[in-house]
Amino acid sequence: MKKIIYPEKKDWMEILRRPAALNTDTLRNTVKEVLDKVKTEGDKAVREYEERFDKVKLDSLGVTETEIAEAEKEVPIELKAAIMLAQKNIHTFHSSQRFEGKKVQTVPGVTCWQKAVAIEKVGLYIPGGTAPLFSTVLMLATPAQIAGCKEIVLCTPPDKEGKVHPAILYAAKLAGVNKIFKAGGVQAIAAMAYGTESVPKVYKIFGPGNQYVTAAKQQVSLRDVAIDMPAGPSEVEVLADETANPVFVAADLLSQAEHGVDSQAMLITTSEKLMKEVEYEVQRQLALLPRWEIAEKSLASSKLILVRDMDEAIALTNEYAPEHLIIETRDYMEQAERIVNAGSVFLGSLTPESAGDYASGTNHTLPTNGYAKAYSGVSLDSFIRKITFQEINGEGIQNIGPAIEVMAANEQLGAHKNAVTVRLKTV
């Protein structure tokens, strides 16, 4: 990890730079080719790309009820219990987000209100890669089920034997997924965006993935389907003072670094002593990790930053807009109130980022790459739309009609004015 001591504000942009992405032109062209082929050839193209990229030959894309039942038997009892606990907490937290619309009378005779309606068809993408992300199944399917989405479709790449990880299937069944398909990468995004003979077309796609999946989601979102948010490599920042435990801080930094070689971990602290202790602890704990090679590469683009005071630490944090922010300071609740840009915040020394990743109840699908300045993480709202309604009676049209006529006339929209005028003549 690179150490930076008392950075000047003019250098912040460079210091906070994320790891470089792949060449966008090459990426865009490769992704477009796959999207176009799946759009025109359907299942056939998906199976061809599965054979090419995932090294598996599939007779069909759908996961059967028999496969789901078999998978349930393969999941260890202790893992089932952990998944059930996590799902319960996620369900509890997201259920509390239900929207209760109320009718508002803006003036006598004019009533307005909103109604929350579920997105009917949603698609969930669950990556394969180096680890089975069954936790992401819970994070996406649970709020979709609470929202009342009628069709919850899940795509995930199979292994070379054509099987989906048992824990993914178990979590999917528990959280209410309707249909599961063996498809990964760009071809999975294309299948859900356009529909194939097997995979239904959905209205919105959720889920993380590599740079190809991210690019595919962005391309299909231009015309064909909505997506959850722009996504990039995972990241964490720990904001700490001299009271923080260096063992905890190092563990939190490494828990993010092991996600992938392009992940980023940052420490911003007011304590030089803590920075040195964390630097030592990171190296000590790194050697003990099973995924140490991945974490080590990630640490190459990670930083330990010493600042002059907490005001500077907060300003630097809000500029970085981290996906995950852990605050380990003496007055962490007070400092938390000053945070305006972050995906999810973890408060105090006993609140690791891992808790939000799995079982505290909050969602771990969060904005990365600085998008926390403008985007929220996934929540119940991500799976609903709010439709507005208005009702106007005779008194109401008399109260607002003349103003509408004046405004429409001044915008030179005569038909708009007339739609009010003909009504005013009848009341």
What residues fall within each predicted segment?
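Conserved small-residue-rich beta-alpha loop and adjacent elements
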Residues: 104-170
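Conserved NAD(P)+-binding/catalytic subdomain of aldehyde/semialdehyde dehydrogenases
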Residues: 176-264
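C-terminal core of ALDH-fold dehydrogenases
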Residues: 319-427
